[in-house]
Amino acid sequence: MERLKCTVSYDGSDFAGFQVQPDHRTVQGVLEKALYNMHKGKSIRIQASGRTDTGVHAVGQVIHFDSPLEIPERNWKQALNTLLPDDVRIQKVEKKTEEFHARYSVKEKEYHYFVLNEEDPNVFQRGYVYHEPRKLDLERMQEACQYLEGTHDFTSFSSAKSSVKGSKVRTLYHVSCHQTGTNIEFIFRGSGFLYNMVRIMMSVLIDVGKGKRNPEDIIDLLASKNRQQIGKTMAPQGLYLWRVSYEENGNNV
């Protein structure tokens, strides 16, 4: 058996999330169907770095699976992409030892969130950005990002549906935002993220940009450990799982 690590991109618009569900089209479902066909009717279970919700996209999701087939890495990529629908692509395939695990070996994850900040929505971007018609104050949001960096208990920024039973302490190494034209890109890089954590943080950052909150309010929100202190969870379509990094052979890859 060989362990294969795959870097996967997908457009989440037409998927009911990543995790397989009966009677729903999911990313895991189409990946496992492609592997089923490659293995001539044998079911192959995949493991992912994490799950994404309905409408959330991925540039660099990572999965692994074990296969008895002896195929060169480059041929794996070509074969799988031939069997996959157009909204899912294998970007890279690497052979790994059995110690590698797509979920448990993760060192760092990076998410990006895109906001279209102009009066009128763009019909061609509607499934790929969050539209905010009110002018946002970029400098205030940049200041607020700094308060999210570091090691904190992110209970206030975790969905009530979170399955995490233990500590909700996480470390964010980098949080920032920058603007290009009318598009604002937010970047979150950390050791791990709670369920809906990025989308809840985005809700607060947008409120700061609108002048509804002050940047330093994040200090009190973190201390309160109360999800009710924060408003809605932001829409999924602006969110992208950008990159997953692993510590392998002493290198962060």
Curated annotation (Swiss-Prot):
Give the record's GO biological process terms: tRNA pseudouridine synthesis
User: What keywords are annotated for this sequence in UniProt?
Assistant: Isomerase, tRNA processing
Membrane-spanning parts:
none
Q: Which Gene3D superfamilies match?
A: Pseudouridine synthase I, catalytic domain, C-terminal subdomain, Pseudouridine synthase I, catalytic domain, N-terminal subdomain
> Residues in the active site?
53
Q: Extract the GO molecular function terms from the UniProt entry.
A: RNA binding; tRNA pseudouridine(38-40) synthase activity
Give the main EC class: isomerase
This entry's Enzyme Commission designation comes to 5.4.99.12
Family, per entry: Belongs to the tRNA pseudouridine synthase TruA family.
| HAMAP family reported for this sequence | TruA
Q: What is this protein called?
A: tRNA pseudouridine synthase A
Source organism per UniProt: Oceanobacillus iheyensis (strain DSM 14371 / CIP 107618 / JCM 11309 / KCTC 3954 / HTE831)
